[in-house]
Each structure stands twice: as structure tokens, then as C-alpha cells.
Amino acid sequence: MIRSQQLKQKIKPQGEIAHGIGNSYADHSERDALRYFLANCNPFQQFWKNYFGTPPNTILKEDPLGEYGVDLGIVTKSNINNETTIHGLIEVDVFNSWGETFPAHYKKFHVLERKLKYFEGTNYKYLTCTFNNTHTQMCCTTRENIERCNLLYGVTEMWMPAIKSHDRVVRCPLDENVFWFGVA
């Protein structure tokens, strides 16, 4: 528990760089960017449709697992009993060091171990999307790839220079299972 609190304190300043003082976990810009890509990026629209399918009467809901859970969910709400059915989950993030071009020294897509709890023990589809610092480029990967990489490579404790601390990640190679999209 102490390690978790220490990590949060180290992450907070980086979050404030991305989202403003006092808003270290307010990723509204990334949520809006995902919606923009859905509306304006045909390749991403097709990828989304292929991955999640097209369940009828769904909406993109913020915080479908609660305030401190995953960012977005594809959900259907029943008119009969007000029950919500989750069809998929989406985590969004920003990589502050990624400007116009992806940093050449990064050879892996990192998925934070602490985010795996959002889908473990469920059958939900899951997509994690990382945006560049201008929200014009995005890379993402799926639950299936994360699980494959976790099985093949495990979880790695890595030094994260931006937060000056170690964090635990699943490292996914930048291969055909990591998808890249851009908008003008």
C-alpha cells in the first residue's frame, strides 16, 4: 500500500504537466481525442468496428466501472431494469514525450500492470490507446495482445525517467498487434 501511495505521488506531477495543476488524473482531453478519432478517422472507425463489433443501442460511457476505474466503456442500458451491459472497455492516456514523431528509442508499447485489473476475470473486450502530446496521433493495442505479451514476457519493473520511479509494465513489441492512427 505504501509503494502504491509513493507511486501516485510521483505520477501526479507528470499528470499535471499533461492536464494542468490539480488535474493530474483528468484525462478529458484524451477522452475527447478518442471521440474525435471515432468521428473523423476512417481507419480507426473500421478497426473499432472489427474489434468491438456493432452492438445495437450502445453509448460510449465515461467511467463505466466507477470514478477510479477504466476511462470509457461501450455500454447498453436496459430500459426495463436500468441495468448496464458492458460490451467493451477503453483506457486512454497521453505520452508527453511523443510529439510529431514517436520517440525512436521506444521499441515497446507499455501497458501498466495496475490497469490489467480492469479486464482480468471478465470477458470484456479491452483497448488501450495512447495519444501524442497534440492528440493528432494514437497507437493502441487490444486485450488479446496484452494477455499474449504478459504470457510470453511477463511483467517488467522498469525505471520511468519522467516520474523518477519504477513502475510495472507489460511490454508489447511494436509489431502488427499495435495499431497506429492519425488525424489532421
Write out the residue ranges for each language-model feature.
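Acidic-basic catalytic patches of nuclease active cores, encompassing PD-(D/E)XK
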Residues: 1-66
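Non-catalytic C-terminal interaction segments of nucleic acid-processing enzymes
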Residues: 1-25, 78-85, 123, 131-184
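Structural alpha-beta junctions
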Residues: 38-56, 118-127, 147-156
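An acidic- and aromatic-residue-enriched active-site/binding cleft used to recognize and process polar
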Residues: 64, 93-97, 133
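Short beta-strand or tight-loop elements
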Residues: 68-70
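Conserved catalytic cores of phosphodiester-cleaving nucleases, focusing on short active-site segments
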Residues: 72-100
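Aromatic- and glycine-enriched beta-alpha-beta binding-site module
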Residues: 89, 113-132
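Mg2+/Mn2+-dependent nuclease catalytic core
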Residues: 95-122
